[in-house]
From Swiss-Prot:
Family of the protein in this entry: Belongs to the metallothionein superfamily. Type 1 family.
Keyword Ribosomal protein: no
Residues engaged in binding a divalent metal cation 6: 36, 40, 43, 59
Superkingdom per UniProt: Eukaryota
Entry binding sites for a divalent metal cation 5: 33, 35-36, 49
Summary of the function given for this chain in its UniProt record: Metallothioneins have a high content of cysteine residues that bind various heavy metals.
Binding site residues for a divalent metal cation 1: 4, 6, 20, 23
One Gene Ontology molecular-function label: metal ion binding
UniProtKB keywords: Metal-binding, Metal-thiolate cluster
Residues holding a divalent metal cation 3: 14, 18, 23, 28
Protein name: Metallothionein
């Protein structure tokens, strides 16, 4: 899957699995958005990004 191009457009939608706003990923699957930190690799399906950190709200 191609990564989001938020740096170019300021917004994106990667195949429905990623939503970005103001060059920031607001929700994504780890295969799409770089904002999901490496710790989120344990998530089986998707990852909810809260800033730049992986906390208890990271994995859904």
């Amino acid at each position: 899957m191609d990564p989001c191009e938020c740096s170019k457009t300021g917004s994106c939608n990667c195949g429905g699995s990623c939503k970005c706003s103001n060059c920031a990923c607001t929700s994504c699957k780890k295969s799409c958005c770089s904002c999901c930190p490496s710790g989120c690799s344990k998530c089986a399906s998707g990852c909810i990004c809260k800033g730049k950190t992986c906390d208890t709200s990271c994995c859904q």
